[in-house]
């Protein structure tokens, strides 16, 4: 036969201040639970941390610095530009002026001209940024580079 017992919570209703939790305050807040949330992960809950969350502490990965937040700098080498210059002219994205193919990299969405590769034809390149080697190679081939964004030295002088 099933023994009918009253539940402890019903039995203690209205009887005592602590409802069998011992001293007043033992059942308050989170003192008996080891703290709220992630409290104690490096102290009294360390065994839990190393078992279930081993990567909780320490650094991981690498965030490369950006020139400006949110700006991805797209680049092109002078060798690549020399290869596609005639194609850009045929598509109408570049024009010919004084025997030079004029390419505006800013309009093409390219931010910087770099110096890898060879330049076989004279080019006139308009770009926000360019490396010294890129400028040197284009000028040696009989072209010119117009840098639209001022360098730090130029900005400090003016």
UniProtKB/Swiss-Prot annotation:
Query: From what superkingdom does this record's organism come?
Result: Archaea
Disulfide pattern: none
This entry carries the following GO cellular component terms, namely: cytosolic large ribosomal subunit
GO biological process assignments: translation
Q: Which Gene3D superfamilies match?
A: 3.100.10.10, 4.10.990.10
Q: Which GO terms describe its molecular function?
A: rRNA binding; structural constituent of ribosome
Alphabetized, the UniProt keywords read: Ribonucleoprotein, Ribosomal protein, RNA-binding, rRNA-binding
Q: Which family does it belong to?
A: Belongs to the universal ribosomal protein uL15 family.
The UniProt function text for this chain reads: Binds to the 23S rRNA.
Summary of subunit composition and partner proteins: Part of the 50S ribosomal subunit.
Name this polypeptide is given: Large ribosomal subunit protein uL15
Phylogenetic placement of the source organism: Archaea, Thermoproteota, Thermoprotei, Desulfurococcales, Desulfurococcaceae
